[in-house]
């Protein structure tokens, strides 16, 4: 198995490549990627592949997204210190760790699979991330107790934009969500809530995510 130094060197090269390709655009996203390397959020047998720009398996038949995809979503979200952010679909905990590093405050992340709640909590603890709160529940309903949010980032594909998530945004807030078919193809939408409560949608092109299962997502 590669040692930590080797893993980090490979990870640094991935970050440099994403920068050179114009995918990582901001210093804050670059800093977060360097502070929270992906190999801390996968099982030991996948650590040596963590620098590869592709999704990797995590427990319960789910995946950790490719680094370029995570960077794209974070750049669209344009997070700032002090923002109140909800993540839907904790998975490995990596994306939540990156968000927490950028906003420098508490981040709430919902996961519906108990095994992944435990997996993410272990990963976050190992990575020394203390400001991510992982909640077991149906992420398609959002998390009203800590709303309204400046941003909601959804890491699973929905059949349509879930109403509760829009309702839980602050005016001027952003929802980043893949919307489309069950498994194969979605479009990455940036949903901006206007001051009057109406929404403006920007389409950032085709993506492929695991399905968002829940009351306002897909049925199992």
UniProtKB/Swiss-Prot annotation:
The active site is at 65. Keywords: Cytoplasm, Methyltransferase, S-adenosyl-L-methionine, Transferase. GO terms for biological process: methylation; protein modification process; protein repair. GO terms for cellular component: cytoplasm. It comes from the Archaea. It catalyses: [protein]-L-isoaspartate + S-adenosyl-L-methionine = [protein]-L-isoaspartate alpha-methyl ester + S-adenosyl-L-homocysteine. The keyword Cytoplasm applies. Its EC number is 2.1.1.77. It is an enzyme of class 2 (transferase). It is found in: Cytoplasm. The keyword Methyltransferase applies. One of its GO terms (molecular function) is protein-L-isoaspartate (D-aspartate) O-methyltransferase activity. Belongs to the methyltransferase superfamily. L-isoaspartyl/D-aspartyl protein methyltransferase family. Catalyzes the methyl esterification of L-isoaspartyl residues in peptides and proteins that result from spontaneous decomposition of normal L-aspartyl and L-asparaginyl residues. It plays a role in the repair and/or degradation of damaged proteins. PANTHER family: PROTEIN-L-ISOASPARTATE O-METHYLTRANSFERASE, PROTEIN-L-ISOASPARTATE(D-ASPARTATE) O-METHYLTRANSFERASE. This is Protein-L-isoaspartate O-methyltransferase. The gene is pcm.
